[in-house]
A protein has these predicted regions:
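Bulky hydrophobic segments
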Residues: 1-92, 98, 102-119
Length: 119
């Protein structure tokens, strides 16, 4: 059962990463976007992706998950700087990614510390 769940979480995480890259490199959303503020979208996206990464790789150290997610966000920004994609790379986008990543890592640390406290 757990092995099937692990495979499912890894597959869902990989699929989500592909969708994020596809969206990040495709044409920019118009004014009808579900979340109108770009930075909120970045933070929310990386909040969800980081949570999915923790489920997909439960034995990976938190700092490694954070570094890998930051690298993923950085890679997206680098790719967006290539004129072929007609997108713009922004440090503020990467900072919003960090906020989303940090929020999940912070919750994971709080949960881990709470489990260590006596009942």
């Amino acid at each position: 059962m757990w092995k099937a769940a692990a495979i499912l979480f890894k597959g869902l995480f990989a699929a989500a990463c592909v969708v994020v890259v596809w969206q990040a490199l495709g044409p920019p959303d118009g004014p009808g976007s579900l979340i109108p503020w770009d930075k909120a979208l970045h933070g929310l996206t990386f909040f969800v992706l980081t949570g999915m990464a923790l489920l997909a790789f439960p034995k990976m150290k938190l700092w490694r998950v954070a570094v890998l997610m930051l690298a993923f966000g950085g890679l997206i920004e680098i790719l967006q700087s290539i004129p072929l994609f007609d997108r713009d790379a922004e440090w503020a986008d990467l900072l919003a990614d960090v906020v989303g990543i940090g929020a999940v890592i912070g919750v994971a640390i709080a949960v881990a510390l709470r489990r260590k406290l006596p009942a």
